[in-house]
A protein has these predicted regions:
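Membrane-core helix-loop-helix motifs of multi-pass transport proteins
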Residues: 138-228, 232-238, 362, 383-416
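Structural signature of hydrophobic alpha-helical transmembrane segments
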Residues: 1-11, 62-73, 116-125, 183-196, ...
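Re-entrant/interfacial helical elements at transmembrane boundaries that shape
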Residues: 90, 123-134, 147, 160-174, ...
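Membrane-embedded alpha-helical segments and adjacent helix-loop junctions characteristic
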Residues: 53-141, 286-355
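Intrinsically disordered, low-complexity non-transmembrane regions of multi-pass membrane transporters
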Residues: 1, 6-11, 17, 41-42, ...
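Flexible hinge motifs at transmembrane-helix junctions and intramembrane kinks/re-entrant loops
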Residues: 17-35, 232-259
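C-terminal transmembrane helix pair
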Residues: 182-189, 325-423
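Interfacial loop-to-helix junctions that mark the boundaries of transmembrane helices
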Residues: 1-4, 24-30, 53-67, 178-187, ...
Length: 423
């Protein structure tokens, strides 16, 4: 590893140190991430030719473009759902059953787990955070709820072919079928969620809150709400056309926006038509900037070969079909995904390991890469998005309350996989 690679690692570590302690230093994590990512690419570019940089930069910007537009579309749809009182409707109807805070905690966790498997972990997290805002008044309860949402979303996404980027990569690479990841991955993934869920439940405090009355959700609103949720389904279906999910998001968002403008200007909700135009302005751009900075930094490490070195160190130079080495490697990679982007690490492993490896080992990689990111809040797209959406949930707060439960869930998931397939 040359001096420039070492310098990149140092900048990356220092950047994350300041991100972790943003409240202590008073500097927003989004600006730190942007500065870190841009600085690392300047170091990478020093001494390189434009021809050599063209393809890596093009690939990095394509990844960032996809995520930014997906996030902008998803956040707009979520804002629209809130605008039409969907989350308030959920609150009122749940409160009618006089469900305790802890029972509600389990119900929402279960919904998040399976919603993530159907949609994806990022979308599910954004939607559930908005629902939780209406259901938990106390900051402590809401933070615990968001922590559990991140863990449940990542666990649910790990057992679905479309729930997480890494499972999509492994599925499209032919490492397992859609049914195999669901059937053989669901039990370890459930364990990765249930153990932290059980631990975090004890931290939920009692809240004496009754559901507030709200406006009835009119038929027109229900139609738009259903159309909004359908947009997330379209984002999954466009994969059949070999298109990235953001195509489905912007397609569905365009249709919903057109219908809103047409129907609201002719119906009873005419007075609210102007508010719809402003929904995009309500998007938390700081969260998106944070994503951009983190992705730039990780792509710089990838271009410099740092991630390949890490993957090679984990598995060795010449990996053969050695179960012990593969299990150890996949488990270690999952732990590293708490700090580094699991996508390039997974991509390196796919290319590195020989063909013919039994699919159950790839199931393990899907589970570890998907759930290992829950150990730190910066380890997954769901965590980073939640960190941007919930200012009170800092890196330190998550580390103090969520990291150990998530780690125990991770260990439990790996142990469950081992008991299922190795004994």
């Amino acid at each position: 590893m040359d001096s420039s690679s070492i310098l990149l690692i140092i900048i990356f570590a220092v950047g994350f140190f300041y991100i972790a302690l943003e409240h202590k230093f008073g500097i927003n994590k989004s600006w730190i991430a942007l500065f870190m990512g841009a600085t690392m690419w300047m170091i990478v570019a020093y001494g390189e030719t434009s021809h050599h940089l063209h393809d890596p930069l093009k690939h990095a910007f394509a990844d960032i473009f996809e995520l930014v537009f997906f996030l902008m579309g998803a956040m707009t749809i979520v804002e629209m759902l809130g605008h039409f009182r969907f989350f308030t409707w959920v609150e009122v109807n749940l409160m009618k059953f006089n469900i305790s805070n802890r029972m509600l905690f389990w119900i929402l966790g279960l919904i998040t787990f399976f919603a993530s498997a159907i949609l994806d972990n990022l979308t599910s997290t954004l939607v559930m955070i908005h629902i939780g805002r209406y259901l938990y008044i106390k900051k402590e309860n809401f933070n615990i709820f968001v922590i559990n949402t991140i863990i449940a979303a990542n666990a649910g996404g790990a057992m679905s072919p479309v729930g997480d980027v890494t499972t999509i990569m492994l599925w499209l690479a032919g490492k397992f079928t859609a049914w195999q990841i669901v059937i053989y991955g669901i039990v370890p993934s459930l364990v990765a969620w249930i153990i932290p869920q059980a631990i975090l439940t004890s931290q939920i405090k009692y809240e004496d809150r009754e559901g507030q009355m709200t406006d009835k959700v009119l038929p027109t609103q229900w139609g738009l709400i259903i159309a909004g949720f359908a947009t997330f389904g379209i984002a999954v279906l466009v994969n059949l056309l070999h298109l990235p999910p953001f195509f489905g998001i912007i397609f569905g968002m365009g249709i919903v926006a057109i219908v809103i403008d047409y129907r609201l200007k002719k119906g009873k909700l005419k007075k609210k038509a102007g508010d719809i135009v402003n929904l995009v302005k309500q998007i938390d751009m700081a969260t998106i900037f944070f994503f951009v900075g983190i992705l730039l930094a990780v792509d710089a490490l990838k271009f410099a070969g740092v991630l390949d070195v890490i993957a090679t160190t984990i598995f060795g130079d010449n990996v053969v079909n050695d179960p012990k080495a593969i299990i150890t490697g996949h488990t270690t990679l999952g732990l590293l995904s708490a700090l580094l982007d699991n996508v390039p690490l997974t991509a390196a492993v796919i290319k590195m390991l020989p063909d013919g490896i039994n699919f159950i080992y790839w199931i393990l990689l899907a589970v570890t890469a998907g759930t290992g990111g829950s150990i730190l809040i910066i380890g997954s797209a769901a965590g980073v998005a939640a960190m941007g959406q919930v200012p009170t949930l800092t890196f330190k707060e998550y580390l103090r309350k969520g990291s150990m439960p998530a780690l125990l869930g991770y260990i439990g998931a790996v142990g469950t996989w081992y008991l299922m397939f190795m004994l």
